Amino acid sequence: LAIRIAALLAAACFLGVALGLRAITGDWSGSGWLAQYSGTALYASMVYAGVILVAPRVSAAWAGVIATVFCWTVEAAQLTGIPAELSARNILVRAALGVHFDWADILWYPVGIVPLVVVDWLLIEPWRRVQPADPERTPSHHA
């Protein structure tokens, strides 16, 4: 449960940083280079946190692979035009799916994911390995 709470808080922090950068720069459209690329990296960071939230026992490396492939899949879907059409109707869908394909985004997703994989691998994964998979099913030594 602690890992899931930490992942949820991390995702909220990444969203806060993204919105804060847009507020500071005044670039709410995301068209400027800072808003666009930081937003792409922070989106990928939120996806990584989402992977940990859904599957807290997954290794850092696999969480990174899953998050990167998810981001690349969403980016590739933008080539179909479907995300753009859905985004025109809802700002939350626009934030989640984007509007148009950008090769630079393909490179910026790992920028948001790789540092989290390293931190997870060095600091959290060793702790995660010593925790019981299901505390309620772990035999108790209490009488």
Question: How should each PLM-predicted stretch be described?
Answer:
Residues 130-143:
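Short, intrinsically disordered terminal tails adjacent to the first/last structured region
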Residues 1-131:
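Bulky hydrophobic segments
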